[in-house]
Amino acid sequence: MTTLHFSGFPRVGAFRELKFAQEKYWRKEISEQELLAVAKDLREKNWKHQAAANADYVAVGDFTFYDHILDLQVATGAIPARFGFDSQNLSLEQFFQLARGNKDQFAIEMTKWFDTNYHYLVPEFHADTEFKANAKHYVQQLQEAQALGLKAKPTVVGPLTFLWVGKEKGAVEFDRLSLLPKLLPVYVEILTALVEAGAEWIQIDEPALTVDLPKEWVEAYKDVYATLSKVSAKILLSTYFGSVAEHAALLKSLPVDGLHIDLVRAPEQLDAFADYDKVLSAGVIDGRNIWRANLNKVLETVELLQAKLGDRLWISSSCSLLHTPFDLSVEEKLKANKPDLYSWLAFTLQKTQELRVLKAALNEGRDSVAEELAASQAAADSRANSSEIHRADVAKRLADLPANADQRKSPFADRIKAQQAWLNLPLLPTTNIGSFPQTTEIRQARAAFKKGELSAADYEAAMKKEIALVVEEQEKLDLDVLVHGEAERNDMVEYFGELLSGFAFTQYGWVQSYGSRCVKPPIIFGDVSRPEAMTVAWSTYAQSLTKRPMKGMLTGPVTILQWSFVRNDIPRSTVCKQIALALNDEVLDLEKAGIKVIQIDEPAIREGLPLKRADWDAYLNWAGESFRLSSTGCEDSTQIHTHMCYSEFNDILPAIAAMDADVITIETSRSDMELLTAFGEFKYPNDIGPGVYDIHSPRVPTEAEVEHLLRKAIEVVPVERLWVNPDCGLKTRGWKETLEQLQVMMNVTHKLRAELAK
């Protein structure tokens, strides 16, 4: 018989119950006991949903109050020593301080979990880090599930992935792999505690196997699993997010009892493991996207596997369902307005039922679930033939693009002369990245307008009032190139998604980004086009208030793609180019309306990098082409800006230069302009605006601090190509500190201009 198990489940609840309880607890509106009760209730509901899908094993240990890697830091005693906390007796309050910081210590750094949009808390390893086991988190959840009469499988991130996703800290140089001999006995203790609590199978997650691991890390798997296999539980080694075919010989040799592979992201790896002689868990339902599976097609694969493996076949989702929204059935608006699209989707609970159907078909025959299989096929057929998805005009436009469609008319050296001829900017021109503070009044007006409580005319008047204020304040500060402040935008992707065809939105399609923060990504379900102008009216109104140049503001195609649930029936590169052409229509309309400085933000270009470096070039080629397609066709005198905010550029600088934006603004203040050095060494050919102060803090920098950064920038970038700007948009700041911060920036700029003019 085929076994059905779950790898992990969303933590926050169908209606973000955990988020709201956490935030009430942080505001001291509920007690710790009340928060614990909400969490216990959510865990029970999650397990019951898994049991209702006829799961043989429910997942335990995956629930967390903040992040599963933070739980592991506590369980192994690897919490940062700088907090002075005892990992053996850590209070919930202290746990949250690790994640959020306190008055004495900054929070543990966050970064993205492999290539997902989930953020984990990065372990801080020192040469002298000591580990100490505390299995309470995992044991408690195992016992809770057992008390409900359920068979449970604890899930723990493995020791090599744990070390891999951490960072070396401290003055002493060392390799974190050297900590393995100290860490391994602690893992043995944790697994032993789980065995003593009744665990039969333990899932150990090693997604690090899907990235380019150095040889010594790969070799280490032999000793690690030789040691862990001595624990008297059965071990399911779980891999996901990509192919592990290159490690097939190693994985087959490890003394574990089963292996999980991701057959959604990497179906081609099945051939490498079809002869595996232990339990093979096939991840066949997508744990990272929201599309209903064609179960008949999936069955073709798993029936062949079952014929080979018999009872050794397990089935599951490709990875934890953490990355998908909870329940499609609550999306009543979507069902009413887009019934076809609704029928093509599957959120977490629907995916559990897809797995139930697959298990029944395998164990009892297809006839036992004939109705469900017919419904799955009908949805797949409807989607394949829908005129809502496939549009001949969009396909033709892409197909008819000439070979040089993504190239500007002239090289940068010619364009910058044409731009400067009319812009007539001083040395060290100043600008803002885009957004200004989103006040309570702005949010209330937007909410009232969406609910129909505020007329379109009144809403427009409220937004224009905010725009006028933003323009006036920038003029008072003497900024050179102005922005309109984006008062009308709730979110930099959602705003455009609502105005482009091929996008849809949910009411409750939340997924956890980190801690209590959840995001509700748009769904790109069909061919993308722009029915009408999206930003022209706002930008031209702002331009009418000033003689200074006004920047048009757009979110770039790659970022819109990365921060959405993307259709899986055509290549992502094709979707990205469709978005690019829709944005290009907007660029040309802005230009026609007299907006001759246009910014196309691409904060997510780096996030899209594939896990394996061999796949980088292909991605960077189509990502760069998409950006250029969005900005092509305009006159040389129109200046295209882009903005990027992340901490590592060196390895993709040629690709960034190939995007050929006239001006790039980047986040650099927190790294003390270190990032800029890479641009200098690379001899980045176009204009650069390094951020001269950190907008993530309300603190107003001193003039000396800003001057220090600007002087460092002048050492690296030719002064005639240097812009001055904050690190990022000002949406999350208050007005008071915003104006004070910008005033400091302007004072320093004026001082250095005077000095350079001598």
Swiss-Prot record:
Alphabetic keyword roster: Amino-acid biosynthesis, Metal-binding, Methionine biosynthesis, Methyltransferase, Repeat, Transferase, Zinc
Entries under InterPro entries matching the protein:
Cbl-indep_Met_Synth_N, Cobalamin-indep_Met_synthase, Met_Synth_C/arc, UROD/MetE-like_sf
Pathway the protein contributes to: Amino-acid biosynthesis; L-methionine biosynthesis via de novo pathway; L-methionine from L-homocysteine (MetE route): step 1/1
CC cofactor note: Binds 1 zinc ion per subunit.
The record's listing under SUPFAM superfamilies reads: UROD/MetE-like (SSF51726)
Q: So what EC number does this one have? A: 2.1.1.14
CDD domains membership = CIMS_C_terminal_like (cd03311), CIMS_N_terminal_like (cd03312)
Q: Which cofactor does it need?
A: Zn(2+)
Q: Which residues bind L-methionine?
A: 433-435, 486, 601
Q: Where does L-homocysteine bind?
A: 433-435, 486, 601
* Coiled-coil stretches noted in the UniProt entry, renumbered to this chain: none
Q: Where is the active site?
A: 696 (proton donor)
Binding positions (Zn(2+)): 643, 645, 667, 728
Tell me the residue numbers annotated for binding 5-methyltetrahydropteroyltri-L-glutamate.
16-19, 112, 517-518, 563, 607
Q: Which reaction does it catalyse?
A: 5-methyltetrahydropteroyltri-L-glutamate + L-homocysteine = tetrahydropteroyltri-L-glutamate + L-methionine
Q: Which GO terms describe its molecular function?
A: 5-methyltetrahydropteroyltriglutamate-homocysteine S-methyltransferase activity; zinc ion binding
Pfam families, alphabetically? Meth_synt_1, Meth_synt_2
Keyword Zinc tagged: yes
Q: Which GO terms describe its biological process?
A: methionine biosynthetic process; methylation
This chain's function reads:
Catalyzes the transfer of a methyl group from 5-methyltetrahydrofolate to homocysteine resulting in methionine formation.
Q: Which family does it belong to?
A: Belongs to the vitamin-B12 independent methionine synthase family.
Instruction: From the Swiss-Prot or TrEMBL record, give the protein name.
Output: 5-methyltetrahydropteroyltriglutamate--homocysteine methyltransferase
Q: Give the organism, scientific name.
A: Neisseria meningitidis serogroup A / serotype 4A (strain DSM 15465 / Z2491)
What gene, per UniProt, encodes this protein?
Answer: metE
